[in-house]
Regions:
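Bacterial N-terminal signal peptides that target proteins for export
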Residues: 1-7
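C-terminal motif of bacterial Sec signal peptides marking the signal peptidase cleavage site
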Residues: 14-17
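Residues within mature, well-folded domains
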Residues: 19-113
């Protein structure tokens, strides 16, 4: 019985431990109605994202992949959740998720090693 359990848990732990962009899927469900989460799509212009989400709490230049990254703070039921929208060098969305821009940069840096 123990070996069967270990057989199923070990690969799952390996996949989770080695993934470079860990995000909580519950956050996607919790914040799915937020305009940034619901409406922003890959390829969208920076101006369009600003019209949807407003000014970010912080904007930083990306160093690992050329471009810009916007940090937002989503609020729901008294809980704050970081959310990033990243842009390529042409100013188009190339990523978004429940991390800070700093965490995104760290993940990208680690993937390039």
């Amino acid at each position: 019985m123990f070996k069967r359990t270990l057989f199923f848990i070990a690969p799952l732990a390996l996949v989770i431990g080695c993934s470079g962009n860990v995000q909580n899927p519950v956050d996607r469900i919790t914040y799915r109605d937020e305009p940034l989460v619901r409406d922003v799509e890959t390829g969208m212009t920076q101006a369009r994202v600003l019209s949807i989400g407003g000014e970010p709490s912080r904007a930083t230049t990306r160093t690992v992949v050329p471009g810009l990254c916007h940090d937002y703070i989503l609020n729901r039921d008294g809980k704050q959740q970081p959310y990033y929208v990243s842009f390529d060098s042409a100013g188009r969305v190339d990523g978004q998720g429940f991390l800070t821009c700093k965490q995104l940069e760290e993940n990208q840096r680690n993937l390039r090693r």
